[in-house]
Amino acid sequence: TTLRKDAEIIDCKGACLAPGLVDMRAQSADPGAEHLEDLHTLLHAAASGGISTIVALPNAKPVIDDASMIDSLSLRATRIGGARLRLYGAATRKLRGKAMAELGLMAEAGAVGFSNGNRCIMDSLVMRRLLAYSAMLDRPFIQHCEDHDLTAAGEMNEGETSTRLGLIGAPAEAEAIIIDRDLHLIRMTGARYH
């Protein structure tokens, strides 16, 4: 193609050119801890860094576990501008890992998937049900793969360094165990999973 003579030329040497990036696991302090970071700051900081869309995990305080919160945050984000905001609905009420949240209502309100944030679903029956509902609603499930029974006391990754320093290590198998279990459940349910 030919450029117009009056076209602005931007020197991009040393720069990284890419389409807008998507942050699939954003942490938001809003609602609940806006003194740390509010939605305006989050969305504009993301846009300034080349992030065009962020998908916020539900582990705010209060937890994003009902449709009205999805509606409210989505509306506020539209008014604020900056990066686009998408939301995961909490998989379980208050992220406790036991009682399922209202997945269907959150999906209708615009939740793009479901997650328990940085807390793994340890109960296999609850996880099976969550995956079945996620599949039925055509939404992915985003899991934090970590067997908390194996990592609760861990101060760092288990290995030579943790042994040498005398620190309690968290074994890598804590992640593999959850992934293995969840792969079996995904085969049963046909759910999409990340």
Regions found by a protein language model. Give the residues of each.
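Active-site mouth loops of central-metabolism enzymes
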Residues: M24-E37, P58-A60, R86-A99, G166-E173
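Active-site-proximal loop/turn and secondary-structure-junction residues that shape catalytic pockets
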Residues: N59-P62, A91-R93, C120, D147-D149
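General beta-strand structural signal in soluble alpha/beta enzymes
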Residues: I10-D11, A56, R86-G89, G113-N116, ...
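N-terminal metal-binding scaffold of metallo-dependent hydrolase/deaminase domains
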Residues: T1-R4
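Metal-associated gating/positioning segment near the N- to mid-region
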Residues: C12-A77
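Divalent metal-coordination and catalytic microenvironments
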Residues: G14, R25, A46, G50, ...
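Alpha-helix-loop-beta-strand connector modules within alpha/beta enzyme cores
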Residues: A18, A67-Y88, A132-E146
